[in-house]
């Protein structure tokens, strides 16, 4: 049986990272607001409040989490572009998913995601090759180059979209 936590597998990539890979990943980041919107289209409130797996987040929480995560990533990129290997602040995503705003309508986060991604993608397309080598330091996972972080967040969006689409398929929604 497939691991419901990782419907598209865990994040991996071939090295070296090529310009073609970067372009593909940026396009996936650009497409995410539309893909996530399509994934939840026509779901009712009960469906939005259904966990994608036993012990997992609800569809609603997944949508809000994507925005929380990508807001953090956008800030990490800006820090890495303006400081030398900044140490970024991790956040407790599982606790964020329990905060009151995670119960808001998903449209609130979809609007935020669309606006955020417009700014983020504009920034990503402006990066020079030397910018892609810039890094940030995560206290738990260490140093990350921006090139790899682009791939990680492209995967992250597809990963959570697949949580929703695979749930819909399993439950025939």
From Swiss-Prot:
Localization per record: Cytoplasm
Q: For this UniProt record, give its keywords in alphabetical order, as a comma-separated list.
A: Cytoplasm, Hydrolase, Metal-binding, Zinc
Is-annotated flag, keyword Cell division? no
GO cellular component term of the entry, any: cytoplasm
Q: Which GO terms describe its molecular function?
A: hydrolase activity; zinc ion binding
| Pfam families reported in the protein's UniProt record | DinB_2 (PF12867)
The EC number(s) attached to this protein equal 3.-.-.-
Q: Does the keyword Zinc apply?
A: yes
- Required co-factor? Zn(2+)
Q: What SUPFAM superfamilies does the record tag this protein with?
A: DinB/YfiT-like putative metalloenzymes
Q: How is the cofactor bound?
A: Binds 1 zinc ion per subunit.
Enzyme class of the recorded protein, top EC level: hydrolase
InterPro entries, alphabetized: DinB-like (IPR024775), DinB/YfiT-like (IPR034660), Put_metal_dep_hydrolase_YfiT (IPR023774)
Where on this chain does Zn(2+) bind? 65, 156, 160
- The main location is cytoplasm
The protein's assembly and partners: Homodimer.
Q: Which family does it belong to?
A: Belongs to the metal hydrolase YfiT family.
**Physiological role:** Possible metal-dependent hydrolase.
Protein name per the record: Putative metal-dependent hydrolase BCE33L2441
Give the originating organism.
Bacillus cereus (strain ZK / E33L)
């Amino acid at each position: 049986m497939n691991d419901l936590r990782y419907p598209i597998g865990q994040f991996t990539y071939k090295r070296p990272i090529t310009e073609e890979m970067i372009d593909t990943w940026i396009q996936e980041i650009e497409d995410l607001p539309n893909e996530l919107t399509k994934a939840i289209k026509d779901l009712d409130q009960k469906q939005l409040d259904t966990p994608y797996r036993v012990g997992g987040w609800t569809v609603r929480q997944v949508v809000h989490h994507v925005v929380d995560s990508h807001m953090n990533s956008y800030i990490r990129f800006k820090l890495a572009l303006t400081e030398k290997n900044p140490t970024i602040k991790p956040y407790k995503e599982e606790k964020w998913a329990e905060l009151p705003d995670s119960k808001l309508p998903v449209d609130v986060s979809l609007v935020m995601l669309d606006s955020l991604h417009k700014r983020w993608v504009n920034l990503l397309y402006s990066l020079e090759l030397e910018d892609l080598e810039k890094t940030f330091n995560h206290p738990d996972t260490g140093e990350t180059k921006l090139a790899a972080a682009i791939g990680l967040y492209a995967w992250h969006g597809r990963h959570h979209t697949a949580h929703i689409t695979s749930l819909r398929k399993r439950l025939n929604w």
